[in-house]
């Protein structure tokens, strides 16, 4: 029993038991609360999630860029300390356009973030 006394941590488990582990506090709070038996109704909720795999436009993600001419973006809008480069949002913060690249967009030219997002969507 000496080994168990050394491992006992009062900050986690509370005060040590008087004799043996059978004297530990037992919480009866859960046994006093009784719930009614589940009723058989037509309004049942399913607990499943179905993820459909569609035509994910991977290259379309790379074509999004911030609109630099947004009227709300100015140096007078302070950024938060945690995200100093947070973009300012107008009604349409993203505009579709091509990002200049040296070659064809393919899977090897994806950023790490895009690769993680695409792989998470494919699961």
Curated annotation (Swiss-Prot):
Keywords, in A-Z order: Phosphoprotein
Listed InterPro entries: DRM/ARP
Keyword Zinc-finger: no
Keyword match Phosphoprotein: yes
Chain spans, region Disordered: 7-86
Pfam family, one: Auxin_repressed
Phosphoserine: modified positions: 74
Compositionally biased region (Polar residues): 47-58, 71-80
Compositionally biased tracts (Low complexity): 30-46
Family: Belongs to the DRM1/ARP family.
Name used for this protein in its record: Dormancy-associated protein homolog 4
Source organism per UniProt: Arabidopsis thaliana (Mouse-ear cress)
């Amino acid at each position: 029993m000496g080994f168990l006394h050394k491992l006992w941590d009062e900050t986690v488990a509370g005060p040590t038991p008087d004799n043996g582990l059978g004297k530990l506090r037992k919480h009866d709070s859960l046994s006093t609360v009784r719930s009614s038996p589940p009723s058989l109704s037509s309004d049942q909720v399913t607990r499943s999630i179905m993820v459909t795999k569609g035509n994910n436009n991977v290259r379309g993600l790379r074509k999004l860029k911030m609109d630099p001419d947004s009227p709300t973006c100015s140096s007078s809008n302070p950024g938060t300390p945690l995200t100093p480069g947070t973009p300012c949002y107008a009604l349409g913060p993203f505009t579709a356009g091509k990002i200049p690249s040296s070659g064809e967009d393919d899977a090897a030219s994806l950023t790490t973030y895009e690769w993680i997002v695409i792989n998470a969507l494919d699961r």
